[in-house]
Amino acid sequence: MEVGLPDNNITLAVIQARMTSTRLPGKVLLPLPFPDGEPLIFNLINKLKLCSQIDQIVVVTSTGELQTPLIHFLNSKGITSIQGDELDVLSRFVSAIEQFNPATVVRVTADNPFIDIQKLSQTILFHKAGNLDYTRTEFLPYGMNIEVASASSLLALNKREDITIEEREHVTMKLLNCTEYKSHIIKSNEVDLSHIRITVDTPQDYMRAALLHQLQMNKPLDKDLNFITNTYSNYPYLFG
């Protein structure tokens, strides 16, 4: 579905982030590695900057005073942020699209600090080559899969009268489930690695991520998949 494609080939990474996580409040500013590393979200941003296929990065968060520490940190680093409705995440993406006018959007969540840059680049290129509305990966570790969407499809979603509150919150749900959109799922690994949990949702997840970042120091930051699979092979109990 093509609706007013921008006259450029800009790829925008949109990071969803908020300070009000139910299970681990303020996690986006917790240090990686512990105790004196950079905030989780800054580690994530620095990794995204390694991807040559990404032109711009923006953080979209919700409104309210609780987000102030995050906004202040992003401002101090010169990182653009946009605030909007907490539950209507799609509207925040639309605001980012209207500000940056990209052709392609990479959806990133701030609780997933591990990204394989090679897989990310491959997914973006595949999405563009296929002129797809939505592309996602599977078979990567839990918290490493990638989502790419055309900006025009997200703008079209925002105008639909039949979109539900849940679909506005989860942004890409309708792109995958609605046959009107041209979507594709890439099996990014021969073996399903989804049992390897590397997302950060709980204190235990954070402790694991902090240790993994400590182990990753002095190793290539653009090869997270190799690092995670090697670490899992050597220390499987870390991922239990």
Predicted feature residues:
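N-terminal nucleotide-binding beta1-loop-alpha1 segment
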Residues: 1-25
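Hydrophobic targeting segments
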Residues: 10-15, 41, 56-59
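Short glycine-enriched, charge-decorated loop/helix-capping segments at active-site entrances
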Residues: 28-33
